[in-house]
Curated annotation (Swiss-Prot):
Protein's recorded name: 4-hydroxybenzoate octaprenyltransferase
Function in brief: Catalyzes the prenylation of para-hydroxybenzoate (PHB) with an all-trans polyprenyl group. Mediates the second step in the final reaction sequence of ubiquinone-8 (UQ-8) biosynthesis, which is the condensation of the polyisoprenoid side chain with PHB, generating the first membrane-bound Q intermediate 3-octaprenyl-4-hydroxybenzoate.
One term of GO molecular function: 4-hydroxybenzoate polyprenyltransferase activity
Native organism taxonomy: Bacteria, Pseudomonadati, Pseudomonadota, Gammaproteobacteria, Alteromonadales
Pathway involvement of the protein, from the record: Cofactor biosynthesis; ubiquinone biosynthesis
Family that this chain belongs to: Belongs to the UbiA prenyltransferase family.
Gene3D superfamilies in the cross-refs: UbiA prenyltransferase
PANTHER family recorded: 4-HYDROXYBENZOATE POLYPRENYLTRANSFERASE, MITOCHONDRIAL, PRENYLTRANSFERASES
Biological processes per GO annotation: ubiquinone biosynthetic process
Catalytic activity line of the entry: all-trans-octaprenyl diphosphate + 4-hydroxybenzoate = 4-hydroxy-3-(all-trans-octaprenyl)benzoate + diphosphate
C-alpha cells in the first residue's frame, strides 16, 4: 500500500472527510470566544481553538472507532470504517490517537494554567464517552458534556475565569447536542438494537420526537439567557428566531422516523449553529 493510500485511510479514520462533527463543535466554541471577549477574541487564542477543535474531534473519532470496532461491522452506516473493515490495525489507530492528543496538548500549553487544568478533564471525557454506550441508555447526554467542554476552556483562555454566563452557554449546547445526536441515533436505531448499543433514540422510543423538541426548547431558552447575560441585541435575537426555524424544520424531517430524513435533520444542525454564531458576531459589530 502506498503512503498516499495509507494517509487517505488515516484521514478517514480521523473523519477528516466528514467535517460535520467538527463544524458542530466549532460554532459553540467560537460563540464562547466571542462572548468571552465581548467581540473579537485574541487572535492567538482564536487560532489555537480552531486547530484544537479539529484535532480533538479527530481524537474523539479515533477512540470511538476503537471502542466500537467489533460492533461497527454489523451496522450498515459504519461497517466501512477503517478499523471495522480492517484497513488499519488497532496499534496504528491508538498510535494516531496519541499523536493527535499530544498535538492538542501542545496547543493547550500555549495558554494559561486554568485552560491546561480543564484540558485534562476534556481528554478524560473524550476517552470515556465511547464506552458509555455499553452501560447507559443516555450516551448522548454524556456526549453533550464532552462536546460542550470547549466552552469553559474558551472563557478560561480569553478571560482567565469561567463566569456564570459560560455555564448558560454550556447548558444550551448540552441540550442542543442531546437533541441533534438523538436524531443521529434514530438513523442507527434498528442496527443498534440488534448489536446491543444503547442510545437515547432507543430510550425515548415512541416519544423520541417530543423529547427532542423539549431539548430544543431548553437549548433555545439557555441560548437566550446567555445572550441576555452578555447584553446582546436585535441581531442576536434574529439569530435565535432563525435557530427556531431550523429546529421546526428538523422536527418535520424526523416526523416519519426514516433513516435518510433523520440524517438530513442531523446535518441541518450545522446551519442552525452557523446562523446563531454569525448573528452573534454581527450583533457585536453593529
Amino acid at each position: 500500500m502506498s503512503v498516499k493510500d495509507k494517509l487517505e485511510i488515516y484521514l478517514r479514520l480521523a473523519r477528516m472527510d466528514r467535517p460535520i462533527g467538527t463544524l458542530l463543535l466549532m460554532w459553540p466554541c467560537l460563540m464562547a470566544l466571542v462572548l468571552a471577549a465581548g467581540g473579537m477574541p485574541d487572535l492567538k487564542v482564536l487560532v489555537i481553538f480552531i486547530i484544537g477543535v479539529v484535532v480533538m474531534r479527530a481524537c474523539g473519532c479515533i477512540i470511538n472507532d476503537y471502542a466500537d470496532r467489533k460492533l461497527d461491522s454489523h451496522v450498515e452506516r459504519t461497517k466501512s470504517r477503517p478499523l471495522a473493515s480492517g484497513e488499519v490495525s488497532v496499534k496504528e489507530a491508538l498510535t494516531l490517537f496519541v499523536v493527535m492528543g499530544l498535538i492538542a496538548f501542545g496547543l493547550v500549553l500555549m495558554l494559561n494554567p486554568l485552560v491546561v487544568q480543564l484540558s485534562f478533564v476534556g481528554i478524560i471525557l473524550t476517552i470515556i464517552y465511547p464506552f458509555t454506550k455499553r452501560f447507559t441508555n443516555m450516551p448522548q447526554m454524556f456526549l453533550g458534556v464532552v462536546w460542550s467542554w470547549s466552552i469553559p476552556m474558551a472563557y478560561a483562555a480569553q478571560t482567565g475565569t469561567v463566569p456564570a454566563e459560560a455555564w448558560w452557554l454550556f447548558a444550551a449546547n448540552w441540550c442542543w447536542t442531546v437533541a441533534y445526536d438523538t436524531m443521529y441515533a434514530m438513523v442507527d436505531r434498528d442496527d443498534d438494537l440488534k448489536v446491543g448499543i444503547k442510545s437515547t433514540a432507543i430510550l425515548f422510543g415512541k416519544y423520541d420526537r417530543q423529547v427532542i423538541a423539549l431539548f430544543q426548547l431548553a437549548a433555545l431558552a439557555c441560548f437566550i439567557i446567555a445572550g441576555w447575560a452578555a447584553d446582546r441585541g436585535l441581531v442576536y435575537a434574529l439569530g435565535i428566531i432563525t435557530f427556531v426555524g431550523f429546529s421546526l424544520y428538523q422536527q418535520k424531517l424526523i416526523y416519519g422516523r426514516e433513516r435518510a430524513p433523520c440524517f438530513k435533520a442531523f446535518l441541518n444542525n450545522n446551519w442552525a449553529g452557523l446562523s446563531l454564531f454569525v448573528a452573534l458576531g454581527v450583533d457585536y459589530l453593529v
